[in-house]
Amino acid sequence: MTLFKDHKGVDKLFQGVQTRINARIRGLTEDQILGTAPALIAGEAVTAEMLLAPTLDPSNYTLERTTGQIHYRVRVMGDSSLMNYVPTKGDKLTPKGDKPTPPEGMALAEINSPNGWVEVSFRVAAGTSADDIEKEYRAWVSQTEEWLSWLRSDLADLQDKQISRITRELTRRQDAIRREQALFDQLEARRSAQGEQ
């Protein structure tokens, strides 16, 4: 899978997160809702369901060689499958080297997400030195880390919005439960008073 190519998937991904959070909140009992601050419940629910933003570990890599190419396999922490999605800020941009058939010296990066690695390959032309490849690798790391920072920003925004939304929803539910309980208590008091007459 080529990095940062899915322009629509991130919205679906975020909808999936929201669906899981909503299911978690719907499963709360009245006692849980009344017994805990809404912001605390919201924070715990969102944290439990949010995706872990990917980060590169550019110093943790292996090298391989095939005819005409040098391959770096770089360790990724977090959910590396998120690297498929275009961050909001990058919607109109294409990362350097992220082309199906790169020219000489350019990188072609692919995700090997089940194992938490990204593979980036550099074409080797006549006269290419180790310094040339390392320079391209550092440039690729820099650009990829910039895109990942945008993706992390998208995830942080989503998390903040979800916490705010759920806190408001739980506050409304707490108020509704308390109103219903007060109404019930009034009716129960009237019933008891009628029984004493």
Q: What residues fall within each predicted segment?
A:
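Acidic-enriched, low-complexity/disordered segments with a strong bias for Aspartate over Glutamate
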Residues: D6, D11, D31, E49, ...
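Short, Lys/Arg-enriched charge-dense amphipathic segments
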Residues: P54-R75, Q174, R178-E188
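Mixed-charge (acidic/basic) macromolecular-recognition segments
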Residues: P114-Q197
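N-terminal "first-domain core" detector
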Residues: M1-E64
